[in-house]
Curated annotation (Swiss-Prot):
Cellular component terms (Gene Ontology): centriole; centrosome; cytoplasm; mitotic spindle pole; nucleus
GO biological process terms on file: DNA repair; microtubule anchoring; microtubule cytoskeleton organization; mitotic spindle assembly; mitotic spindle organization
PANTHER family assigned: BRCA2 AND CDKN1A INTERACTING PROTEIN, BRCA2 AND CDKN1A-INTERACTING PROTEIN
Region Disordered, residue ranges: 1-43
Role according to the record: During interphase, required for microtubule organizing and anchoring activities. During mitosis, required for the organization and stabilization of the spindle pole. May promote cell cycle arrest and DNA repair.
Subcellular location: Nucleus; Cytoplasm, Cytoskeleton, Microtubule organizing center, Centrosome, Centriole; Cytoplasm, Cytoskeleton, Spindle pole
The species this protein was found in: Danio rerio
Gene: bccip
Record protein name field: Protein BCCIP homolog
Length: 301
């Protein structure tokens, strides 16, 4: 059954799809009698409220779609991973559009998932096929893209039992504003503390493993004398740079062969073509307070 809102995180953002529809309507209404107005650019900002809800069975398709955007063509069973996320619904949230008044023109699906957050304990779920495939993929990329020290530390974490590692998943569509991440992460930390108190696997994590969608600008064909191309790593979810700064193991691998040039949501770059990457990070859980403070400073308006 559909879940009810257990807490609310209201934010404002622009929905590109809605803006496109508004633009089309404006052009149709202007008619042929006013061709000049019909050619004018329509730049309408759409106000959207979002709410955080407890994860439920109804969210399967939405969560799976977001996981597919993260993992692309790698051999991770996103259906099985989605099932795990739904089964442990005592931790994590999904983002939906706030309840729309009956007299509103908005015909969107009230159960549409715009994003989600969750934590899956990898150490406690050893032998689960989709998670083993995920760990194999990370270790393979680590061998190719990380340092020998990074490889050794990653192997010890993912293949050993001495320290518990949780997979932190925080995904949303690009048109959802980053400010919504702050209350979601704060709520997740509270839920993990409660899971620890009640001896649930999600509360036993000593390290946090993240896979972030990142991009680097495509290098220009010609560079002026003395001008060096900056190898800048851009995070699709802006706030995840706070985790990157505190990571003790981190590396990036290119997914250009698996995806088109990614849109970062940083429109000030004039939609400059980007080379898509995935950035893997390991963060000690005792650094979460520092991360949350940095995130608060960055996202608080």
């Amino acid at each position: 059954m559909a879940s009810s809102a257990k807490r609310r995180a209201v934010e404002t953002g622009q929905n590109p799809q809605d803006s496109d529809e508004s633009s089309d309507e404006g052009l149709e209404d202007s008619g042929d009698d006013d061709s000049e107005n019909s050619e004018e650019e329509v730049n309408e900002e759409v106000i959207v409220d979002f709410e955080a809800h407890t994860i439920s069975d109804n969210d399967f398709h939405g969560i799976k779609t977001l996981l597919q955007q993260l993992f692309l063509k790698c051999h991770v069973n996103t259906s099985d991973l989605t099932d795990i996320i739904i089964q442990q619904n005592h931790i994590g949230s999904v983002i939906r559009q706030a309840e729309v008044p009956e007299d509103s023109d908005d015909e969107g699906d009230p159960d549409e998932v715009f994003g989600f957050i969750s934590m899956v304990n990898l150490t406690e779920r050893q032998g689960v096929e989709c998670l083993e495939k995920l760990k194999d993929m990370i270790l393979d990329q680590c061998v190719k893209c990380s340092t020998p020290d990074g490889q050794e530390r990653m192997e010890n974490l993912l293949q050993g039992n001495a320290q518990s590692v949780g997979l932190l998943l925080s995904e949303r569509f690009v048109n959802v504003p980053p400010q919504i991440a702050l209350p979601l992460h704060k709520q997740l930390q509270k839920e993990m503390a409660e899971a620890q108190r009640t001896n649930k696997p999600s509360g036993k994590c000593q390290f946090c493993l993240m896979i972030s969608k990142t991009c680097k600008p495509l290098k220009k064909k010609s560079i002026s004398a003395g001008d060096q191309a900056k190898d800048e790593l851009l995070f699709v979810n802006d706030e995840e740079e706070c985790f990157y700064e505190q990571a003790t193991v981190k590396f990036s691998y290119c997914v250009q062969d698996e995806a088109d040039s990614c849109a970062t949501g940083k429109w000030s770059y004039d939609d400059e073509p980007m080379k898509p990457f995935r950035t893997v990070m390991v963060i000690p859980m005792d650094r979460m307070d520092t991360i949350m403070q940095k995130m608060t400073d960055y996202l608080t308006v």
